[in-house]
Amino acid sequence: MLADPRRSAPPASLDLSAAREVLGRVWGHADFRGLQSHVVAEVLAGRDVMAVLPTGGGKSVCYQIPAILRPGVGLVVSPLIALMTDQVEALKQQGVAAARLDSGVSMEERSAIWRAARSGELDLLYVSPEGLAAGSMLERLSEIDLSLIAIDEAHCVSQWGHDFRPDYRSLGRLAEIFPGVPRIAVTATADARTRDDILASLRLGEARVFVDSFARPNLQLSAERKINGSRARTDAAVVELVRERRGKSGVVYCGSRDGCERVAQTLRDGGVNAIAYHAGFDAKDRDKRLERFLAEDGAVMVATIAFGMGVDKPDVRFVIHADPPGSLEAYWQEIGRAGRDGEPAEGITLYGPSDIAWSLRRLEGRPMAEEVKQVQTRKVRQLFAMLDGAVCRPQAVRRYFGETDAQPCGVCDICGDPPATFDAVVPAQKALAAVQRLGERFGRTRVVDHLLGKTKDVQSWESSLSTWGIGADLSLTAWRDVIDHLLFEGLLVEDPNEGKPIIRLGDSESVRAVYRGERPIQVRKAPVRVVEAERPRRNAGRNLAAEALDTDVRARFEVLRAWRRDRAAEQHVPPYVIFQDKTLVEIALSEPRNLDALGRISGVGAGKLERYGKDVLEALASAN
């Protein structure tokens, strides 16, 4: 049994005024947002907390500020080296004593970090769950005065979550190893069941739970149906979408490594600075590719889910899913890479029936308990029901996460151009009956032809069926949309059948409910296709704050960006770690003439003012 760590009681005078002072001095912000102040107050008081805050909602501040104010070192458990590196570099730029321990840290650096931790020189120490489980790390941590333990991306703890990692399950023992040390678990994506699992697994039974709104008002969401599952057409659609946003930083998610490299190459052939990223590259190569994306303006990362949480670049203007993820949690997490600076951004998803079939087959191949598999299957269907539905997309997602009072966002594709729908209960009954009468042994095209009474070389056994030709009242396109919608709803299921997909009936009780007329079915009429020549251009993904500047202000902004790029290259850090675009815009607009005026701009904390203030003023002067 490891010894209990030493821990000093927090000073009685510690309150939110001190936290606000740190927020202003270090981060350059006047006050907290949303539930941040409530979470910070609980941790400062030494109480356990679980916080579910939206991506870009400042989750890390909720444990970073208490770690700075409370005596000792704040231990942060984070799932990815890239994520740790990003946060540690940002903290160092702000004058906070932070360090990380991972496979990329040399023995000499490790020794220096442990010395700093023991001597009280360190505010925050970042480690991975694997690192905690290996060697003597826990023993060494027991010799340190810990101010708190933060578990970042806490959804990784839960088997019900979208990114379950077994090593996270062992973090519950920290409650016994470090009794009395307050713990905070933070995540951006956890439904009620996942939240309960996190609390139980981490032994946070007495924790205060804070769940903020999942609203991301700066994100414009849209989804577009793929055509006939054609990979070439989907690739062409992705290329067109990216070209429309040329010069903007973005992320394109693909479902496979081959698709990732193919799309990246196609974009490069078209003059786009596209970078492929997937788990097939070795660690050093992935690090280099990530560094390029973080450092280069207008770069587009084409990635598999291996990219996931490993980026905190604030000026990503769009996220495109060439292939949908596996759940609404994963969807919200991944589109959350866009617009973290609060400026307008886009989340665009391309989807089709073959995608849901692929997602379900992938689940079948994973070793998991039957109950878990059923839950994950339901999550897949809930995602596709949202994508193919006619309800405001953010509203649907927010209600899924428990915000029952969520209202339409007013900016997604559904709100901007509400799709026409038709009552498809009777067509659904006909389609289900046709699949059943045909013995559940044909594919989508054959079923539609059967409903229309147009099967080539029809045999007498088929033409004698009661369902032959009963769908002549609908068009070919309408029937395809009905069948697709039934697949998305799980009323029909597609089996691969050795490369010749067939469709069969889905959940029997749900099918019976349709037959009885107890389940409403609304199908969208003729959805917009992704490869139409005349696609309306969107502007939600544009950095309006920067692009709307007049000529003189724009010139100052570009000079500041060039200065930032040079400083970032010298320090081998991403440019946004020095200053975000929106901070540079404020500087260009206000033209501060002295350090006091510069220090009053949001995003310019005391550390950055001291480090860069004179250089910024000189750069401004040169622009004039």
Tell me the role of every PLM-derived stretch.
Residues M1-A19, V375-T377, A406-N624:
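Accessory DNA-binding and partner-docking regions appended to nucleic-acid-acting proteins
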Residues R7-S13, S17-V26, A30-G34, H38-S60, ...:
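Helicase motor core with emphasis on the C-terminal RecA-like subdomain
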Residues A41, A200, Q333, I348-G352, ...:
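Generic alpha-helical structural context detector
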Residues V43, V242, F293, L387, ...:
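Short helix-to-turn junction characteristic of helix-turn-helix DNA-binding domains
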Residues P179, R246, A390, E440, ...:
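Flexible coil/turn residues that form the inter-helical turn or adjacent wing/linker of helix-turn-helix
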Residues E371-E403:
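Short, charged low-complexity linear segments at domain edges
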